[in-house]
Amino acid sequence: MGRFRGGLRCIKYLLLGFNLLFWLAGSAVIAFGLWFRFGGAIKELSSEDKSPEYFYVGLYVLVGAGALMMAVGFFGCCGAMRESQCVLGSFFTCLLVIFAAEVTTGVFAFIGKGVAIRHVQTMYEEAYNDYLKDRGKGNGTLITFHSTFQCCGKESSEQVQPTCPKELLGHKNCIDEIETIISVKLQLIGIVGIGIAGLTIFGMIFSMVLCCAIRNSRDVI
């Protein structure tokens, strides 16, 4: 009986440690998602009227999952401390929802990468052509693109040189830069999503083991 209670206590503390880590991970995920969505150059691009909102769906899901992770981390600590099967069962269900959300984020980031790249490239080409037709019409949009991706023009930068960053050294094709930068960012989002999903699996295992151990301890008593 003493060994059984010792094992139960060990599992409980493991779950408490997991929930602390999970809470911290949730905070990091929220900070990461908000910085990616509203920080720096991405903020400038997202302010455009033609901004592809679906491009940010993965980030919205990531931030929402991060907030849920923080709440669930606290919820799981309460369940472990009180040794409540009901609370632990609810905790497992919440982890399952977070797992699904994070997997969705990761899959969307990897699979939707090509669509997002093509959409932003099309936006740039439209702004580029508008500028060539009317130097005032697409001026602001083109400046935003060039500043965001630190590039200038397509095959040549001579026709759009006034809209290019002054600090830019040499010529960088915007079509290529858009593909490179968006690909890297979405891969990072996907890796974070899948990584958190993997962490969630351990939480589900710990919660179920503790729940079963609590039930068995009560049966023994």
Curated annotation (Swiss-Prot):
Q: How does it sit in the membrane?
A: Multi-pass membrane protein
Chief localization class? membrane
- Keyword set, alphabetical order: Glycoprotein, Membrane, Transmembrane, Transmembrane helix
List residues in topological domain: Extracellular: 35-54, 112-188
| Residues bearing attached sugar chains per UniProt | 139
Ranges per topology, Cytoplasmic: 1-13, 76-90, 210-221
Q: Does the keyword Transmembrane apply?
A: yes
- Domain of life, source organism: Eukaryota
| Classification via InterPro entries | Tetraspanin/Peripherin, Tetraspanin_animals, Tetraspanin_CS, Tetraspanin_EC2_sf
The keyword Amino-acid biosynthesis belongs to this UniProt entry's keyword annotation: no
Q: Which CDD domains match?
A: CD81_like_LEL (cd03151)
Task: Kindly give the PROSITE patterns that the UniProt entry links to this protein.
Answer: TM4_1
Query: Biological process GO terms, please?
Result: astrocyte development; axon development; inflammatory response; microglia development; myelination; oligodendrocyte differentiation
| GO cellular component entries | membrane; myelin sheath; nucleoplasm; plasma membrane
Spans traversing the lipid bilayer: 14-34, 55-75, 91-111, 189-209
Q: Where in the cell is it found?
A: Membrane
User: A Pfam family for this UniProt protein?
Assistant: Tetraspanin
Relate the protein's function as given in its record.
Answer: May play a role in signalling in oligodendrocytes in the early stages of their terminal differentiation into myelin-forming glia and may also function in stabilizing the mature sheath.
* Similarity comment: Belongs to the tetraspanin (TM4SF) family.
* PANTHER family tied to this protein: TETRASPANIN, TETRASPANIN-2
The name this protein carries in UniProt is: Tetraspanin-2
Which species expresses this protein natively? Homo sapiens
What is the organism lineage in this UniProt record?
Eukaryota, Metazoa, Chordata, Craniata, Vertebrata
